[in-house]
């Protein structure tokens, strides 16, 4: 996931076009992306050994397209610029693809119900639906970009169902790939589950969850547990994909042009070249390393609610069970899969992943 134009974690506000008269985007420039973003996507693909599908998310239209003439502090998209903004988004996608970057997902707006001191823009559910239906999707079709998977909401979970029930209509259903959500208002796993049950064909994607220094301490164990708890709860409720935001920050928790500094799984000091892998990095790896692309979550039961668990079956037939123990006591577990038993103990304040072969014999 990366930002279309600037976001709070940019070095400052910027837009690819700043001239209100440039409706044809002749001055369109991706210079900032070319310098600070695209090289890292290319490096990630190099290390992964395959192409990576990118999610593009706008935090705000250019200032001149908004009611407050400001990228920051909320405001709304001016109606007369709706088509221009839709075409701007299409141009951004095309510029990425012209540079060899695959844009797979697009969200309409980051946190559309929030007025932030940084890049932000407000939409009601009805306004987001109207922009999608009458402006964005037609523009994508005209540009030959209808393959892009559009996800709505991209905000906290507690209003996820409200967004889905408002935005999915007979005319928009085929336009909507799914819904994106954040964790800032609490667990709300039932909201995720409700959307999964009512809209089983829609993708559910976690797109953002920062550990803000202004609200939380720097306790590595607590922060790692926040990640694992949310991932387990969301996966059990029907989540399909998890994006970390941000996986890498500098030693201060930035850069961030409004000092909204945060913790991250990987912290780097650009001056000393030191890299610190936080405990949260290894907690996330319990999922990302063992749960393979194409895996399916499977049903499982547990004898106590003091142990948080989620189970998957990989495309190769292996079973993966992730167990999170946030208590101060060691928890005994006997894992039963297809008649085979594996006994183990889950240490206090720990996360454990068990991988079993298709027939139930433990292999890791």
Model-derived regions: residue spans:
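N-terminal catalytic cores of secreted or lumenal carbohydrate-active enzymes
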Residues: 1-103, 124, 134
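Residues that line or immediately flank small-molecule/substrate-binding pockets and catalytic motifs
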Residues: 2-4, 110, 182-183, 246
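Short catalytic/ligand-binding loop motif for oxyanion handling, primarily in non-cytosolic enzymes
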Residues: 6-9, 62-66, 114-115, 159, ...
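Substrate-binding and catalytic surfaces of secreted/luminal carbohydrate-active proteins
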Residues: 54-56, 87-94, 99-104, 115-364
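Active-site loop signature of alpha/beta-hydrolase-fold enzymes
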Residues: 62, 111, 212
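Short, histidine-centered active-site or binding-site loop motifs used for metal coordination
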Residues: 70, 112, 210
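Short, conserved phosphate-binding/catalytic loop or strand-edge motifs used
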Residues: 108-114
């Amino acid at each position: 996931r990366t930002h279309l134009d600037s976001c709070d974690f940019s070095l400052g506000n910027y837009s690819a076009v700043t001239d209100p008269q440039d409706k044809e985007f002749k001055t369109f420039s991706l210079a900032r992306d070319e310098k600070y973003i695209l090289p890292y996507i290319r490096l990630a693909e190099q290390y992964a050994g395959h192409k990576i599908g990118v999610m593009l998310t706008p935090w705000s239209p250019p200032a001149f397209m908004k009611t407050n003439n400001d990228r920051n502090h909320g405001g709304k998209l001016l109606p007369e610029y709706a088509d221009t903004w839709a075409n701007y988004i299409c141009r951004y996608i095309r510029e990425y693809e012209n540079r060899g970057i695959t844009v797979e997902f697009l969200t309409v707006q980051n946190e559309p119900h929030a007025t932030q001191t940084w890049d932000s823009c407000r939409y009601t559910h009805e306004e987001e639906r109207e922009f999608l239906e009458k402006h964005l999707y037609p523009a994508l079709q005209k540009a030959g970009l209808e393959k892009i998977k559009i996800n709505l909401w991209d905000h906290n979970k507690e209003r996820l169902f409200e967004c889905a029930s408002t935005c999915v209509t007979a005319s928009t259903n085929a336009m909507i790939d799914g819904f994106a959500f954040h964790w800032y208002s609490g667990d709300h796993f039932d909201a995720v589950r409700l959307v999964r049950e009512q809209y089983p064909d829609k993708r559910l994607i976690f797109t953002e969850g920062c550990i803000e220094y202004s609200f939380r301490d720097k306790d590595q164990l607590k922060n790692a547990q926040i990640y694992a708890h949310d991932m387990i709860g969301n996966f059990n409720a029907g989540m399909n994909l998890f994006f970390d935001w941000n996986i890498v920050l500098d030693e201060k928790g930035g850069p961030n042009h409004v000092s909204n500094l945060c913790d991250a799984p990987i912290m780097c000091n650009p001056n000393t070249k030191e890299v610190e892998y936080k405990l949260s990095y290894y907690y996330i790896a319990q999922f990302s390393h063992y749960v393979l692309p194409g895996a399916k979550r499977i049903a499982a039961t547990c004898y106590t609610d003091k142990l948080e668990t989620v189970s998957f079956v990989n495309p190769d037939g292996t079973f993966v069970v992730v167990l999170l123990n946030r208590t101060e006591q060691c928890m005994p577990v006997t894992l039963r899969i297809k008649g085979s038993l594996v006994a183990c103990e889950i240490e206090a304040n720990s996360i454990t992943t068990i991988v079993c072969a298709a027939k139930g014999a433990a292999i890791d």
